């Protein structure tokens, strides 16, 4: 009687983000991106990172229109609904929007960024 040994192998590959900046970390009131700590909401896109003042700062989001296919909006610790006016403006500009809590938005952004997708994220800090 012989015993078969099954060996599972996990393949690891280095993730290459090119010149884009992934979210390296986050915590209460901050994000770490590109080695810098941002103590505010942020907008990340293929062109860089900048401060985001929240839902009333719709001009910064609308400016992403031609550069992206999807915008991930992280609403902080908990998922919350976007103001209807903001949703209407983004949809009117042809921007696909996915709303989730900020930790989920960070992870999703990083995965799709590593795949070279045309995405951006607008993130509010967690509590």
What is each residue range found by the language model?
Residues 2-58, 114-126:
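Non-catalytic interface/targeting segments
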């Amino acid at each position: 009687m012989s015993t078969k040994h099954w060996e599972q192998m996990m393949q690891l590959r280095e993730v290459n983000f090119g010149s884009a900046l992934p979210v390296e970390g986050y915590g209460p009131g901050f994000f770490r991106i590109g080695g810098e700590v941002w103590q505010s909401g942020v907008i990340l896109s293929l062109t860089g990172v900048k401060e985001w003042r929240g839902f009333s700062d719709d001009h910064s989001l609308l400016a992403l229109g031609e550069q992206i296919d999807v915008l991930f909006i992280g609403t902080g610790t908990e998922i919350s609904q976007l103001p209807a006016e903001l949703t209407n403006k983004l949809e009117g500009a042809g921007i696909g929007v996915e709303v989730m809590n900020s930790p989920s938005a960070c992870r999703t952004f990083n995965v799709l960024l590593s795949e070279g997708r045309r995405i951006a994220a607008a993130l509010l800090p967690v509590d």
